[in-house]
């Protein structure tokens, strides 16, 4: 059994694997990152370290999250590929107040290949409708990953 944090984008439900979550915070203020796509909400500082923050609703639909009491900044462990370094990445999520415990095998392929949204994972159907698993490691296109997490300069 896996534990998931549920959230919504519009009327649709999505899930994040709780094992990929470092912290769930209230909605945080961010500093703009010039040159970043509009769905990059900005930069925040947590425990003295800068953390880039994505607006997941803006990434998926072009419309930013609505600041509500249920809107959260969720810090995840972002890693591109199995051998890549791990970074903290913030995600602005709406209605991030519920969890789901289920067998990960209950998520099945959705039948689509969203090349423009490779972070969209398998889906699960329950009494409330579909839930789609968000793949954290696939959230950032290569150019945005290079902007937010540049490779260290050689010594």
Residue ranges and their predicted role:
Residues 1-155:
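An acidic, low-aromatic, low-complexity terminal/linker signal
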């Amino acid at each position: 059994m896996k534990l998931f944090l549920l959230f919504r984008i519009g009327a649709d439900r999505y899930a994040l694997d709780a094992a990929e979550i470092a912290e769930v915070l209230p909605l945080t203020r961010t500093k703009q990152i010039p040159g970043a796509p509009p769905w990059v909400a900005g930069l925040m500082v947590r425990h003295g370290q800068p953390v880039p923050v994505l607006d997941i609703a803006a990434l998926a639909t072009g419309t930013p999250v609505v600041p509500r009491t249920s809107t959260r900044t969720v810090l995840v462990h972002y890693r591109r590929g199995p051998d890549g370094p791990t970074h903290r990445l913030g995600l602005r999520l709406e209605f991030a107040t519920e969890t789901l415990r289920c067998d990960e095998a209950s998520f099945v392929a959705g039948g689509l290949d969203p090349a423009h949204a490779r972070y969209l994972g398998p889906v699960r159907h329950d009494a409330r409708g579909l839930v789609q698993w968000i793949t954290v490691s696939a959230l950032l296109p290569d150019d945005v990953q290079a902007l937010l997490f540049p490779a260290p300069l050689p010594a």
